[in-house]
Amino acid sequence: MKATQMILVASLAAFAADANGKWTAVFDTQIGEQNYTYEFKSDGKKLTGTATSKGNPAVQIEEGKVDGDKISFVENFSYQGNPIRIEYTGKFDGADKIQFTRKVADYAVEEIVANRVK
């Protein structure tokens, strides 16, 4: 029985994704190509860090969570004087790739891929 429990615990730990570090994504949007760098730090299920689009200052991510192979956070910033909320939900695809759905306020929903910088 104890051996079964230990195997279960070990297998669950293997599914916990490591979000820590720098990630990049380049993707097309309604306003043109976007080039992003994300810097993540996870502590248990809590995720903190920054999202930086090329040519703009870093934005602190909010509401960040990592749960197994799932990741989510919010990027709030101002574009041409208008507040914009971008909601990210994603799933790790191996150790070095995250498949994200990015909901940009009521304007767009985008599928993007972030790759770990090694």
PLM region spans:
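Hydrophobic h-region of N-terminal signal peptides that target proteins for export
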Residues: 9-17
